């Protein structure tokens, strides 16, 4: 049999690229017939992923990365609707991706056969480009099966209403999600001006030859049962958790001295005594909210490690959060002195290293799917503080459907006027450290997630099925 080549086209963004590369790495380790070429679209936001991707490519002889030339960015006023800006930026890159794919295909030797293209789910607008090469398109979901079910359901819901949802609308009945979904926890993109761009993405999901999901069947059984009952759904391959357990992304953003300081501090804390607050690469707060978080932590009486990043100053063209240069300016008077025996505040944090540390006992999170999987993997219960994208839906399901998290907020949205008060924060932090029932359940599901990716586990079997289907779909027709 010829060598088989898969082309990956991740969406531009740290979480999307890292997940795609980690999935690619797992494919290469599983089957030596396969090689992978990644067509990488540059992120519109500043990133320090270069050293991470270079190291990963250098460690895998059958993995190569080709940079797609930067296209013109959408007008900056669209950045007020992040999903709209993100989707338009991807669509602007379609001609450049077509050219890169053309050049790559024409350069291939006869001994290597391109068997398919794995597109990030946000890159569905490129399916027609892949079709031009008579190649099958597979979608890679960096999120979960419940969210995939929502994407399948969204066009049907729109056909009934024809407009963005309102808070007063009835709950949505999504086939792959057990409880009815309140409109206030639907993805932010449905109400921030991105609705029709988002609808355009969701309406093309069924055109894919198959969909790879970063989850496992045991975590989302109901969603996978709903896919099996729907004859119009493409095959869905749960292959997760797909995680960067070496925290290579974080280390590319963090010097060794900073990391050592954090880990050394954790080493001095009792087991499961520290609550970790971290809100992802784009999570940030105003100074007013920072003060309330500080007071809430103090009221809780718990030890804490807080990754503190601020909203960019007004008038800034950047959407990227900034580290705080002077903590005393933004924290309540005397806070640092009063909590110096109990807390540590940092900028960027090595999240996986922290979650895997024996001292960590709770996680206040923005509920990005990668962060949820990392926390479950390491058996750390979560307090929900969603901010953007589909995080409100993730938080809702984590608390109401899975019973694996504790609610602080399910519908908080970044950029709003709401300030969560110290009392609410303090109670939530204390509850996650004291709730033994949720902690036990999270530790149990962590074991399940680990077994899923071991030889013979559900995700390992599903990965093998994906490989065989891809190869059979291509070589079986020759």
Curated annotation (Swiss-Prot):
Enzyme Commission identifier(s): 2.4.1.-, 2.4.1.358
Binding residues annotated for an anthocyanidin, in chain numbering: 16, 389
InterPro entries with a match to the protein in the record: UDP-glycosyltransf_plant (IPR050481), UDP_glucos_trans (IPR002213), UDP_glycos_trans_CS (IPR035595)
Catalytic residues as annotated in Swiss-Prot or TrEMBL: 16 (proton acceptor), 120 (charge relay)
Reactions the enzyme catalyzes: a 2-acylphloroglucinol + UDP-alpha-D-glucose = a 2-acylphloroglucinol 1-O-beta-D-glucoside + UDP; quercetin + UDP-alpha-D-glucose = quercetin 3-O-beta-D-glucoside + UDP + H(+); pelargonidin + UDP-alpha-D-glucose = pelargonidin 3-O-beta-D-glucoside + UDP
Purpose: Glycosyltransferase that catalyzes the glucosylation of diverse hydroxycoumarins, naphthols, flavonoids, acylphloroglucinols, and pelargonidin. Involved in fruit ripening by synthesizing acylphloroglucinol glucosides and anthocyanin.
Broadest EC class assigned to this enzyme: transferase
GO BP: fruit ripening
Organism: Fragaria ananassa
Domain of life: Eukaryota
Protein name, as recorded: UDP-glycosyltransferase 71K3
Protein family: Belongs to the UDP-glycosyltransferase family.
Keywords: Fruit ripening, Glycosyltransferase, Transferase
Matches recorded under Gene3D superfamilies: Glycogen Phosphorylase B
One of the record's GO molecular function terms: UDP-glucosyltransferase activity
Binding residue positions for UDP-alpha-D-glucose: 142, 349, 351, 366, 369-371, 374, 390-391
